[in-house]
């Protein structure tokens, strides 16, 4: 890589110029902007070529340049996955394309099995079939790398098995550090494949003990779970500060919080009443009161630094790793029945059609009339439970919600009502049940009030020309839409690529399906076709909600993005102290980091649920269970247990002695001799062969020995389609 010659602009300066230019920026425009001599223009040409090779820029028609945000032709990759088919996948170690998901590249190895998860390689990359492949140029010597695993003893030697179900290799242990067989340990890797060894640096206890599953995720994803001493001291101090006299007093209103029965914190509360403004006939007034976290957590404070490092709270079935110290998150900031609390109040004027006629924000003091569980609020409205606040608080909320719901139906947001799993534990942390979480009107009511407040927050800041940390959800990419079209064709469902894609486009597909058996998997495929939402100071709209401006405002106890929006509102409306905001590039970096922390939390929560599900199902190993196929690959298929969840592999080697054709577009395996078909969404009984609570992995077999194979099995992959389908059928 050539270094810029003296007099030439730096890469950063060129990127800044291209980004800020109001017209196409070619070599001539760049040279003129930086006043380059004829000799320096020669160096500029070489520099621009280097930047293109590095993936920093690309040339548009007419030789204008733009920031590419793509994969460099030569880059350092970190190995992140080795799938069941033996394919190795890596991701760029550095990725600076804001808002663009980090790509996964399939790595072509000279020696199969020579690379392991966590290794770093220098690789040459190229596009192939809509995806990326990488050719390893050399491996990079690793720094000290840690692995979480379980010790196993065999013939006097100790071996370490990783808790990561993607990392299937065992490592010989050179030093147990006093740990015993069966212990969950943190170890350091040494050496390189195939001679990697491990040295135990911390003993964590019994991996099968209640509450260990979340501990595994905390260690694996390096989630900060201990506050700095100065943070705890500061939290104790600010918790005692008075609320002040310059707050709007809302304590006489019957404001209520409606939350899950097991909620650990209470960010939000709501109130509604008919509007007596003659300019808003049959309209409503609503207040969404949100915990005033910005009053307690000031920019640059010790609490703020710890919160920013975490990005959000992480919720597990047995514990929460809070973004804020417990004295704030579970007590002083949390809105509680009968106690005075500081709030940032969003006052809405809602028309009879559910439109926002006006909005304003104030700092207030509230005293909740009640904390009510979703189930109790729903039962009270349905007449199944007598509640003293039914007529004074709940009924007006439901009536105002009818207007908000009408506006929501008119804008037609994406409506994918997919069930969530809920793990129920006893007091000792043992699993009582795993079941889909019930979805009530009470849930939808609170969602619509929160969405209305989030929209008001974004628009209020735009009106004040203040910085906004938007919640962005972009339109699905063409690549994902093509994959969805191919999938829908297998059910004879038309999907025109030439149409303008809106959320309603997908809703109509679901409506046409009706109550067909394959409806859940079609909804899952539509969900997979969507882009991942993220935080950014540049507004790209929220596709899924069908909204032009959207920001997260309603959960500052558990999301740093919401705290940023609170500070912006406090500053824009001159509501007192705590309104300082990051600016420019720092705001962009903050959006990127909290988006990454959000994804980290989601993965940790999902993996922990998988471990609990595997533990729950471990008592049913050997039994035949009803399943549904959730992903088809060239090495088998994945299935989930009805009513419980958890993805498990049905290896192709156990499907009998047939040759199987893998059709990527229809997501199915077809037996050449038997004509047996295994396709996405298919329901079938399978025997649960293995359930590993430590890794969360499940494995299935065909029932009644149907999988016994008299001859070698193999898969014949249908040609002409890119090999970019992975676990759960996702395109990367």
At which residue positions do the language-model features occur?
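A generic structural motif
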Residues: 85, 131, 155, 195, ...
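Intrinsically disordered, low-complexity linker and terminal regions at domain boundaries
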Residues: 119, 183, 651-698, 703, ...
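Short, surface-exposed secondary-structure boundary micro-motifs
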Residues: 126-127, 190, 630, 689-691
């Amino acid at each position: 890589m050539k270094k810029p010659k003296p007099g030439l602009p730096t890469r950063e300066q060129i990127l800044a110029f291209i980004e800020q230019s109001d017209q196409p920026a070619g070599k001539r425009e760049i040279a003129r902007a930086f006043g380059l001599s004829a000799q320096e223009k020669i160096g500029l040409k070489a520099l621009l070529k280097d930047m293109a090779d590095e993936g920093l820029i690309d040339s548009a028609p007419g030789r204008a340049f733009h920031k590419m945000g793509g994969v460099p032709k030569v880059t350092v990759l970190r190995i992140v996955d080795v799938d069941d088919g033996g394919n190795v996948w890596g991701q760029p170690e550095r990725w600076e394309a804001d808002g663009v998901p980090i790509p996964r590249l399939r790595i072509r190895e000279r020696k199969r099995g020579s690379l392991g998860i966590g290794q770093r390689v220098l690789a040459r990359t190229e596009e192939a079939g809509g995806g990326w492949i990488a050719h390893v140029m050399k491996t990079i010597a690793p720094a000290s790398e840690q692995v979480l695993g379980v010790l196993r003893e065999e013939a006097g030697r100790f071996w370490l098995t990783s808790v990561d179900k993607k990392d299937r290799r065992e490592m010989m242990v050179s030093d147990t550090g006093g740990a015993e067989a069966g212990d969950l340990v943190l170890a350091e890797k040494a050496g390189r494949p195939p001679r990697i060894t491990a040295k135990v640096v911390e003993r964590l206890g019994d991996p099968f003990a209640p509450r260990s599953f979340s501990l595994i995720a905390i260690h694996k994803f390096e989630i900060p779970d201990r506050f700095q001493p100065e943070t705890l001291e500061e939290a104790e101090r600010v918790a005692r500060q008075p609320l002040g006299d310059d707050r709007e007093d809302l304590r006489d209103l019957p404001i209520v919080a409606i939350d899950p029965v097991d909620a650990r914190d209470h960010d939000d509360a709501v109130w509604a009443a008919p509007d007596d403004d003659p300019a808003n006939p049959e309209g409503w007034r609503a207040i969404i009161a949100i915990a005033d976290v910005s009053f307690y957590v000031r920019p640059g404070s010790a609490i703020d630094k710890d919160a920013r490092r975490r990005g959000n709270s992480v919720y597990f079935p047995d514990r929460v790793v809070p973004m804020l110290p417990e004295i704030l998150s579970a007590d002083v900031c949390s809105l509680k029945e009968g106690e005075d609390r500081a709030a940032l109040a969003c006052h809405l004027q809602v028309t009879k059609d559910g439109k926002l006629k006006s909005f304003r924000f104030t700092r207030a003091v509230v005293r909740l009339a009640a904390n009510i569980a979703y189930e109790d609020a729903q039962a009270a409205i349905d007449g199944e439970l007598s509640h003293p606040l039914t007529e004074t608080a709940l009924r007006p909320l439901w009536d105002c919600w009818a207007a908000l719901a009408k506006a929501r139906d008119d804008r037609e947001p994406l409506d994918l009502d997919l069930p969530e799993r809920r793990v129920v534990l006893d007091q000792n942390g043992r699993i009582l049940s795993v079941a889909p979480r019930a979805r009530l009107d009470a849930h939808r009511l609170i969602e619509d009030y929160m969405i209305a407040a989030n929209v008001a927050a974004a628009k209020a800041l735009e009106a004040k020309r203040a910085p906004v940390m938007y919640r962005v959800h972009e339109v699905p990419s063409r690549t994902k839409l093509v994959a969805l079209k191919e999938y829908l064709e297998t059910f004879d469902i038309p999907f025109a690529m030439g149409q303008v894609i809106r959320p309603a486009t997908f809703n109509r597909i679901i409506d046409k399906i009706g109550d067909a058996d394959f409806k859940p998997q079609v909804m899952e495929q539509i969900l997979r076709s969507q882009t991942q939402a993220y935080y950014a100071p540049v507004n790209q709209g929220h596709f899924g909600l069908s909204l032009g401006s959207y920001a997260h405002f309603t959960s500052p106890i558990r999301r740093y993005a919401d705290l940023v929006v609170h500070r912006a509102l406090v500053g824009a409306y001159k509501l007192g102290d705590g309104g300082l905001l990051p600016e420019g590039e720092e705001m962009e970096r903050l959006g990127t980091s909290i988006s990454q922390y959000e994804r980290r939390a989601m993965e940790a929560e999902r993996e922990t649920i998988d471990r609990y599900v595997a533990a729950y199902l471990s008592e049913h190993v050997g039994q035949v269970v009803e399943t549904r196929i959730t992903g088809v690959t060239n090495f088998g298929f994945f299935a989930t247990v009805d009513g419980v969840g958890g993805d498990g592999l049905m290896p192709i080697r156990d499907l009998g002695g047939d040759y199987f054709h893998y059709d990527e577009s229809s997501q199915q395996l077809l037996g050449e001799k038997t004509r047996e078909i295994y396709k996405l969404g298919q329901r079938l009984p399978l025997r649960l062969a293995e359930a590993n609570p430590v890794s969360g992995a499940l494995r299935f077999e065909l029932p009644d020995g149907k999988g016994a194979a008299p001859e070698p099995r193999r898969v014949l992959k249908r040609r002409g389609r890119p090999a970019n389908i992975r676990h759960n059928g996702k395109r990367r």
